[in-house]
Amino acid sequence: MEQIDDLQEQLVNFITTQVCIVDNNTFVLVANWYPKDKPETYEGAEKYPAKVISININTKTVGWTLYETGLLKSYTDGGYIDGKKIVLSSDLNANFCVFNYENGANGSEAPETHFAVRNIRLIGQHFYAVSSRRNIYRRNSKHNWEMISPIPHQLANPNNIATHAIDGFSESDMYMCGDSGDLWHYNGDIWKQLDPPCNWRMTFLICANNGMVYVGGEQDQLLAGKNGNWDEVITQELAFNKGYTAYDMTFFKDTLYIATGFSVYSLKENSWVSVDEISSRSTLECIDSNSDIMIIGGRDKITIFDGKKEEILYSDNSDLNKAKVVTSSIASIADDIRDAGDELLDTIQLMKPKK
């Protein structure tokens, strides 16, 4: 596959932080400003522009919209609602950007209730956003977000409040996960807290088309379940523990994949195995798929994988690769510190005496 000139141009001084497949011809990237002449200033990237870029690989055309501020941490998903193509992106502070493909980007969208975003997923006909303290929001329409979180008496353990991911087979069969083995199921009416056989930090969640629910951890731990039966496939003791961090996870053609930052791994016989067909280059941090194709994004590479071979959509072979790895690690550490601070504030809030 030849590289798209417009995409190369749009990514000058930008790095990819999120990828999304809308359909077989439409991919979306979130890209953060990265000044090649002054890479050391990347640590202040939240002050600078970011882009949501839509790519049509059939027509080789590129559309984009610009955020006024950067997206040091971004979340994106897209697909079709009522037959119309749509993409939603957000940063940690619920600064949403909607791309609806009829008139380009709708610009910023602010919900009536402010909340911190940890994950976005299009399930059925609605976007869902995960916030801290087990707060789940459903987007009913533009600017209209409805909270559908568990009510207080449903909380078997109210202290495990950091929530990280959501996914679902349908809008009446959804799961969410968070810290210390905090795992929940939603039947369209109420949330039920589950009791998995582990208590590590759950950061990724996939409801796969084989009927399985996969829950992953940052150190490559893995929990798998179906019909209420859960198996800790890869325990904390058996995880990599080699300095790798899992950044993203997807299920593609009957196989589970994770992006660790330096390589892509697939699950085979209850072990993570490097996918040699996907060449590593610096960082590979974001991954998404549908039934036909998988897209992997990194700081200097975007590639499409069909299960057998990769085709590079974008590549940057600049001398800044090593610097990007370092700043990526710094950004990841900063995100962890920010999350820990949010959790501490949540805990303090819960401890305050009621008036």
Residue ranges, per PLM feature:
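Surface loop/turn motifs at the tips and blade-to-blade linkers of beta-strand repeat domains
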Residues: 8-11, 65-71, 109-113, 150-158, ...
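Repeated scaffold domains used in trafficking and secretory/extracellular systems
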Residues: 13-20, 68-83, 113-125, 159-165, ...
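Short loop/turn segments that connect beta-strands within beta-propeller blades
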Residues: 58, 100-104, 140-143, 186-190, ...
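Solenoidal tandem-repeat scaffolds enriched in leucines and small polar residues
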Residues: 136-225
